[in-house]
Amino acid sequence: MKKLFLTLIVAFATLCGFAQEIVKKDATFEDYLPLFNEAGYNVFSYDISSLKDVSSLATLTVLEYVKGEEVESKYANEALISTLLKISEFDEDAQRRIKEKGSAYDEENDIYRLATKLNISFTPLFNDSIQQLSFELTGTESIGYFSSWMILRDNRVDKSHRRLNYYLRPFKLEKFEKGKFIPLLIYGSSWWDADCECYRFCGDSELSPDMTSELLKDSPHYFIIGVKFE
């Protein structure tokens, strides 16, 4: 009986050892995302498929502000891209080829190409004073692309301080209005807080589209990234 009891103890200990084993796994893309974000790579996606009946053009815009006042940017800050291309806009021969190949997005509803998603991406350049911003409209394939540079400013109150960071915050998405500019993101500089003797970029986690956020009053330099559909 004693021998059987000892055997059971050894077997149980062996099973526990296996249960507590550390198993190596391959890292997934989700595991890499925090590293990309920390390095300055960010992508924001928006579903625009429901706008197909009310919009055929998108104006992609970057607005720059210094101390709350809009200023003229050095680089191109606006692009007009078609979000909807109809089969009927082609000549008769082209329409026939499209239908023969079955290459239309929705032949029944006269849609050849349709943008269903808007991607906004941020890519750091090998320069701490420039940030690249890209817009891409996609459907079953890329529909349109626009890229520009945002020139960052040195907003340190003391040049012995480290270089200031810029931060991203989203705007709240409210009811769609055709022809109205929709702010989607802010990319803004932190500011010096004399009370805590530190730089801050705090406030609303999502900004109101009516531009009343205190953060817009405090940040000395920021960009508003948005779109208008017509």
Protein language model features and the residues they cover:
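Sec-dependent signal peptide cleavage junction
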Residues: F18-G40
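Bacterial Sec-dependent N-terminal signal peptides
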Residues: M1-K24
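Short, surface-exposed loop/turn motifs at beta-strand boundaries within globular domains
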Residues: F36-V43, D53-S55, D218
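Structured domain cores in non-transmembrane regions
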Residues: K52-H161
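Short edge beta-strand/loop segments characteristic of extracellular beta-sandwich folds
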Residues: S45-S49
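Mature extracytoplasmic/lumenal regions of exported proteins
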Residues: N119-F229
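Residues in well-ordered beta-strands of folded domains
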Residues: T7, L63, G226
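Hydrophobic residues positioned within well-ordered beta-strands of beta-sheet architectures
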Residues: F44, L60, F223-I225
